[in-house]
Amino acid sequence: MRTGVIAKKVGMTRLFQEDGRHVPVTVLKLEDVQVVAVKNKDQDGYVAVQLGAGSAKAKNVTKPVRGHFAKAEVELKAKLVEFPVSEDAVLEVGTSISADHFIAGQLVDISGQTQGKGFAGAMKRWGFGGLRATHGVSLSHRSHGSTGNRQDPGRVFKNKKMAGHMGARQRTQQNLEVISTDAERDLIFVRGSVPGSKGAWLIIRDAVKVARPTDAPYPAAIKAANGNEAPAAPVAAEGQEG
């Protein structure tokens, strides 16, 4: 199992295929995605890599977190995410990951926070049909109706579908197809829509329900110092040498 990446949602557009058909895609951008920390079994009990993306001002980062980045000798990041990986997929701290980490035709899972819609009624939030237009119904045509039973249990059950805040929930869309990538501009084009608004941070992983393509870079597509893609160089997790 290899690491995923952190990307920022740019927006939607369309790409034309060779036969003239157009495909609606979401544009995702990798902004200076680097390995900030590595977790190992001896010290942490599990193996993982912590990635950082974007950039942050020092005044917006707490002193302990600034020390965390200073230890890794990387710039301050706006977003930190930890990815569990196999022992042979551990990357060195400071490694930069390219958009070629995923390949065209590959299926990925994308997680993010959905767009917030504010306070919404039961018809918009849950698709309820509402009450009748006439026959005794007054001022309650779009209400959700009864919410409970009788004296027993004498309460409204938890998770009852009612009016409330709609959206702004962490959600994952599975098996989205990667149409193409642009390593020079660090862009990934994914078929269809993904959770989140423009500018939102998203987490992209290999699909869990479909096998990873055999020609996908393993353990990662790494940027060389000159900005070009370099072959991946896995390192053993601390305490796993020998």
UniProtKB/Swiss-Prot annotation:
Signal peptide: none
Ribosomal protein among keywords: yes
GO terms under cellular component: cytosolic large ribosomal subunit
Modified residues (N5-methylglutamine): Q151
Stretches that traverse the bilayer: none
InterPro entries: Ribosomal_uL3, Ribosomal_uL3_bac/org-type, Ribosomal_uL3_CS, Transl_B-barrel_sf
Keyword set, alphabetical order: Methylation, Ribonucleoprotein, Ribosomal protein, RNA-binding, rRNA-binding
SUPFAM superfamilies the UniProt entry points to: Translation proteins
GO biological process: translation
Pfam families: Ribosomal_L3
PTM text: Methylated by PrmB.
GO terms assigned for molecular function: rRNA binding; structural constituent of ribosome
Superkingdom, natural source: Bacteria
Keyword NADP: no
Subunit annotation: Part of the 50S ribosomal subunit. Forms a cluster with proteins L14 and L19.
Family: Belongs to the universal ribosomal protein uL3 family.
Function: One of the primary rRNA binding proteins, it binds directly near the 3'-end of the 23S rRNA, where it nucleates assembly of the 50S subunit.
PANTHER family the record matches: 50S RIBOSOMAL PROTEIN L3, LARGE RIBOSOMAL SUBUNIT PROTEIN UL3C
HAMAP family, per database record: Ribosomal_uL3_B (MF_01325_B)
Protein name from the UniProt record: Large ribosomal subunit protein uL3
Organism: Zymomonas mobilis subsp. mobilis (strain ATCC 31821 / ZM4 / CP4)
